[in-house]
Amino acid sequence: RADRPVAPRVAFGVIADIQFADAEDGHDFGGSRRRYYRHSLRLLREAVRAWAGESPPIDCVLQLGDSIDGQNARRGEAESALQQVLGVLGQLPVPVHHAWGNHELYNFSRAQLAHTGLYSRPAGGSDGPPDRHCHAYHCSLAAGLRLVVLDTYDLSTLGRDPDSPCYQEALRVLQEKNPNEDFNSPAGLMEPHFVAFNGGFSQAQLDWFDEVLKFSDENEEKVVVMGHVPIHPYASDGVCLAWNYEAALSVIHSHRCVICVLAGHLHDGAYCLDSHGVHYLTLEGVIETPPESNAFGTIYVYEDKMILKGKGRIPDRVMHF
């Protein structure tokens, strides 16, 4: 008889940079790349339909940030755009884990986001850093498999009160590293990732991350990490990269449990496998995906590998660990 295929330990949907707005198509800041604001919701609906039809059913969805576009704030449509996106995701009977991106923070302050459906950090607070407005947390996906959600804008001028110490510290970083009049411009920078549309990690979050990975090491767990901004330069274009990415990598490399780091932000997508055997997968963004294509996938985790089945612009991958 044929051997029955081994069932995955866990399966989860992945999607990034939906950036929905009820607006005509536009372009990126460079003016060269088309953005399909209104179509992105239709592509999300297709993704949800596909995930809902999977058998065995998926366990959860990882939404990697920038669910709605920044222009919603100017149009007074932040709330309604978010409700439409969450309404579609809410049709799935499984949890959705959200990373906060720069576009969430163009639309809402951190305090406001904490009262929306994008706040997926578990109630009670013991699962994340001491700062309740830091959207980082961990949870078990299955026996021996943990998810860690990182907040890549913990250190940022976005979504923070200008009087707050966090804002002031982030402003100091930008002033020191970016002499351009426009902090969103990487022009001429030796370190082009020091721009305002990226962010970084507070020491408190890094210390917390280290403790979680220590726990997973001790309990022989494997860990999947997710956050909006890439943290490995080779899973990036050199610009879309967390400010203090080296600090995050050094936490990961001082443990053996992390198998994969998922990110968005870079709409072209990227991938690398580092010298420690960690996979860094940056997903192609829905927002720059033509209406006849798509950009989502499902990752199936087995004992010794993860298999990504991608749709549209996202290629299939086998990632061994």
Regions found by a protein language model. Give the residues of each.
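Short acidic, glycine-rich surface-loop motifs adjacent to enzyme active sites
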Residues: S216-Y234
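Histidine-centered catalytic micro-motifs
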Residues: V225-I231, I259-G269
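Hydrophobic beta-strand anchors of alpha/beta hydrolase catalytic cores
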Residues: F12, V61, L147, V223-V224
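N-terminal active-site segment of His-dependent metallophosphoesterases
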Residues: R1-E79
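Short, solvent-exposed loop/turn segments at secondary-structure junctions
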Residues: D22, G70-N72, H232-A235, L241, ...
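Active-site glycine-centered loops adjacent to acidic/histidine catalytic or metal-binding residues
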Residues: D17, G65-D66, G101-N102, L150, ...
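Extended active-site neighborhood of metal-dependent phosphoesterases/phosphodiesterases
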Residues: R1-V6, G30-R34, N72-N219, N244-C257, ...
